[in-house]
């Protein structure tokens, strides 16, 4: 039991050490958090608002369900 606990603690420590000392030239976590903060302040900057969707009566994709307001039925947005 003690050995198992020691192994778990060692793995967690090494994982944390790897993430803390990783060389990321793009500042991955810093960019991630600053972009998320920017999107909270400016909802127009969110990538979700820029999705392409089809209006009612246009041809649509059954798999993606890419209609803006309704559903894709028989390849036409309703």
Curated annotation (Swiss-Prot):
InterPro entries the record matches: Conotoxin, Conotoxin_d-typ_CS
Source species, domain of life: Eukaryota
GO cellular component entries: extracellular region
Tissue specificity statement from the Swiss-Prot or TrEMBL entry: Expressed by the venom duct.
GO molecular function (one): toxin activity
Any coiled-coil regions, as ranges: none
Physiological role: Delta-conotoxins bind to site 6 of voltage-gated sodium channels (Nav) and inhibit the inactivation process. Binding of this toxin is strongly calcium-dependent but not voltage-dependent. The binding site is most likely on the extracellular side of the sodium channel. Binds receptor sites on both mollusk and rat central nervous system, but despite its high affinity binding to rat sodium channel, it has no functional effect in vivo and in vitro on it. Also has no effect on Gambusia fish. Is important in mollusk for the paralysis of the prey.
Annotated SUPFAM superfamilies: omega toxin-like
Additional record remark: Veratridine increases the rate of dissociation in a dose-dependent manner.
Family the entry assigns: Belongs to the conotoxin O1 superfamily.
Signal peptide location: 1-22
Disulfide bonds: 53-68, 60-72, 67-77
Cellular location(s): Secreted
Protein name: Delta-conotoxin TxVIA
Record's comment describing the protein's domains: The presence of a 'disulfide through disulfide knot' structurally defines this protein as a knottin.
PROSITE patterns from the UniProt entry: DELTA_CONOTOXIN (PS60005)
Keyword tags: Cleavage on pair of basic residues, Disulfide bond, Ion channel impairing toxin, Knottin, Neurotoxin, Oxidation, Secreted, Signal, Toxin, Voltage-gated sodium channel impairing toxin
Primary localization: secreted
Propeptide: 23-49
Lineage: Eukaryota, Metazoa, Spiralia, Lophotrochozoa, Mollusca
Modified residues (Methionine sulfoxide): 59
């Amino acid at each position: 039991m003690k050995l198992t606990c020691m192994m778990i603690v060692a793995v967690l420590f090494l994982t944390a050490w790897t993430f803390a000392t990783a060389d990321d030239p793009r500042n991955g976590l810093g960019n991630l958090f600053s972009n998320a903060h920017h999107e909270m302040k400016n909802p127009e900057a969110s990538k979700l608002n820029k999705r392409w969707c089809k209006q009612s009566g246009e041809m649509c994709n059954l798999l993606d369900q890419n209609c803006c307001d309704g559903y894709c039925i028989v390849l036409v947005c309703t």
